[in-house]
Amino acid sequence: MSAPAAELAQTLDLRLLGRTDYEATVQAMQAFTSGRDAGTRDELWICEHAPHFTQGLAGKSDHLLNPGDIPVVATNRGGQVTYHGPGQVVAYPLLDLQRLGYFVKEYVFRIEDAVIRTLEHFGITGHRVEGAPGIYVRLDDPRSHAMLAQRPQLRVPGSPAPQPDFSGLGKIAALGIKVSRHCTYHGVALNAAMDLEPYERINPCGYAGLQTVDLSTIGVQTTWDEAARVLGRQLQRRLAP
């Protein structure tokens, strides 16, 4: 890697945008990504959105149980249906993975690690679940460090992935990404202090009965601004080469 490229790879410019329109933000991410060149600095956009459901590329209409008056927006990220609304910290890393020197699987791992470290800042233990991207917490003891039986583990090569098991867990962060010409957009949403009722109108991420939580329901009192700053710092650190 040349010296200028190495310097760019170390830089992730943070933009705290506040409340933004979802569709306009997606269009802006697409324009940023399509207009990139070798000298474009990576950016991290953090915002929140008005209430709406988004359907990913794999989305199925039967996971929309009763959207009611909340708009449903088709989008080009990976994954199934999820909900965005006030009190949720949405982070969009706009990265050149080729320049950073890692692949999509590691990128996902690094995003999840940033969320886990963010939760740790608030005294909460985040967990991964085999076969289900995102971060989860124990409903009975969100601060417990005990490992989950459902955690990702080494499998015999060629063996099928197990069906995700969400017993005793609540989902606190959802992940949905898009990679175009080795450049990323879309990202991760961390629930801070939300109205969680809209999640009852869908099968979150395509899983019937999956419980969704936020920081406030598990005993953490914080503001959107604080949660956004902590997540932003962690993503800046964890996404560096």
Curated annotation (Swiss-Prot):
The active site is at C205. PROSITE patterns: BPL_LPL_CATALYTIC, LIPB. One of its GO terms (biological process) is protein modification process. It is found in: Cytoplasm. Substrate binds at R77, G78, G79, Q80, V81, T82, Y83, H84, A174, L175, G176, G187, V188, A189. Keywords: Acyltransferase, Cytoplasm, Transferase. It comes from the Bacteria. The keyword Cytoplasm applies. In the reaction, the free carboxyl group of octanoic acid is attached via an amide linkage to the epsilon-amino group of a specific lysine residue of lipoyl domains of lipoate-dependent enzymes. Catalyzes the transfer of endogenously produced octanoic acid from octanoyl-acyl-carrier-protein onto the lipoyl domains of lipoate-dependent enzymes. Lipoyl-ACP can also act as a substrate although octanoyl-ACP is likely to be the physiological substrate. This is Octanoyltransferase. It comes from Delftia acidovorans (strain DSM 14801 / SPH-1). The gene is lipB.
